[in-house]
């Protein structure tokens, strides 16, 4: 690592730091979006779970409004919500890795953040 440390110029260090920080912010943004989606799915599930399973409902599929029953839609919505939760877990793991990478980089080059 010390050879790599010596090979990077100040501008390269700054750019690499900015890239790492940007990647971290992108992951945070995606987590936020997906958590919002999970919340919306939860609202829909709460709204329709007590309805009769043969009751008519509509769902947007690929930009087309499709008529289904609550019994058909509810399991699909729960499955989608659970899939999004898994994606959030993986993104949380990625965020932890990226944060550690960023902190290690800051420690290696003794970067001090000053507010502008």
Curated annotation (Swiss-Prot):
GO BP terms: namely:
positive regulation of cytoskeleton organization; protein folding
- Which superkingdom heads the taxonomic lineage of this protein's source? Eukaryota
Listed under subunit, the entry gives: Heterohexamer of two PFD-alpha type and four PFD-beta type subunits.
- Keyword annotations: Chaperone
- Record gene name: pfdn2
* Sequence similarity: Belongs to the prefoldin subunit beta family.
Q: Which GO terms describe its cellular component?
A: cytoplasm; prefoldin complex
Q: Which Pfam families does the entry mention?
A: Prefoldin_2 (PF01920)
Q: What's an example of a GO molecular-function annotation for this chain?
A: unfolded protein binding
CDD domains assigned to the protein according to its UniProt record, in alphabetical order: Prefoldin_2
What's the protein called, per UniProt? Probable prefoldin subunit 2
Q: Which InterPro entries match?
A: PFD2, PFD_beta-like, Prefoldin
Q: So what does this one do? A: Binds specifically to cytosolic chaperonin (c-CPN) and transfers target proteins to it. Binds to nascent polypeptide chain and promotes folding in an environment in which there are many competing pathways for nonnative proteins.
Keyword Protein biosynthesis included in the entry's annotation: no
